[in-house]
Amino acid sequence: MLETVPVRCVERKITSLVVDLSGVPIVDTMVAQQLYNLSKTLFLLGVKAVFSGIRPDVAQTSIQLGLDFSEYETYGTLKQALENMGVRCIVEELEENK
């Protein structure tokens, strides 16, 4: 992850990246550290990292490790993160208009 994501972001001129953790069943100390390193690397490349779907146990693991994610935007769900970035879910709008 740490090797490919930053390279792809630069290649594709990505300015913001949502890292959604809602489908990740277990986050141990190594994964939490990798996420932190990824966010710092992206910052240095000018890519804004946004986190969504962080569960309480993931937050606790990060705090226990002394990892400070407070400088990053975090959202409870991917939908909230995307809406805040101005991305609207067209599928839901189509269903609502039926």
From Swiss-Prot:
Q: Which InterPro entries match?
A: Bact_StressResp_Reg, STAS_dom, STAS_dom_sf
Which Gene3D superfamilies does the entry link to?
STAS domain
Q: Where is the STAS domain?
A: 1-85
Q: Where in the cell is it found?
A: Cytoplasm
- In what way is this protein post-translationally modified? Phosphorylated on threonine residue(s). Phosphorylated by PrkC and dephosphorylated by PrpC.
The entry's keywords = Cytoplasm, Phosphoprotein
Presence of the UniProt keyword Cytoplasm in the record? yes
What intrachain disulfides are recorded?
none
Source taxon at top rank: Bacteria
The entry's cellular-component GO terms read:
cytoplasm
- PANTHER family named among the record's database cross-references: RSBT ANTAGONIST PROTEIN RSBS-RELATED, RSBT CO-ANTAGONIST PROTEIN RSBRC
Tell me what this protein is called: Uncharacterized protein YezB
Species source reads Bacillus subtilis (strain 168)
The gene from which this protein is expressed is yezB
